[in-house]
A protein has these predicted regions:
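Beta1/beta-strand and adjacent pyrophosphate-binding region of the FAD-binding site
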Residues: 1-13
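Glycine-rich flavin
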Residues: 2-5, 22-28, 34-123
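The conserved SAM/SAH-binding core of class I Rossmann-like methyltransferase domains
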Residues: 10, 33-34
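N-terminal Rossmann-fold NAD(P) dinucleotide-binding loop
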Residues: 16-17
Length: 123
């Protein structure tokens, strides 16, 4: 690949993509390289966001189970883990695509792959 950039950010986590966007906003031709295949880092892809999504769904399940304490009777409530996981995955996808959109909007070139230095001026 022979594309030339004034700045290249290796890593598309919260530090990397924000840095890449800011560099582009300052007028530098910028690229961002992320090995995971989706932007946002650990928190967005496999940490905070997926965990909070599942915790929220679990809380909703708990609330529905205890509605009768407030005078609302419902039938049997069951967990469908497959649907819960799909809901969690959808939330993650929406947010990672949002980060990808921000890179495009700010004219940052996004590469899926591993970035390493070949020389002082070449990645």
């Amino acid at each position: 690949m022979t594309d030339k950039f004034q700045a290249v950010v290796v890593g598309g986590g919260p530090g990397g993509y924000v840095c890449a966007i800011r560099l582009a906003q300052l007028g530098l031709k910028t690229a961002c390289i992320e090995s995971r295949g989706s932007l946002g880092g650990t928190c967005l892809n496999v940490g905070c966001i997926p965990s909070k999504s599942l915790l929220n769904l679990s809380e909703e399940f708990y609330k529905v189970q205890h509605l009768s304490n407030k005078g609302i009777e419902v039938g049997e409530v069951k967990l469908n883990l497959e649907k819960m996981m799909k809901s969690k995955d959808k939330a993650v996808t929406i947010l990672t695509k949002g980060v990808e959109f921000l890179l495009k909007k700010n004219k940052v070139t996004y590469y899926k792959g591993i970035g390493s230095f070949k020389s002082q001026n070449e990645i």
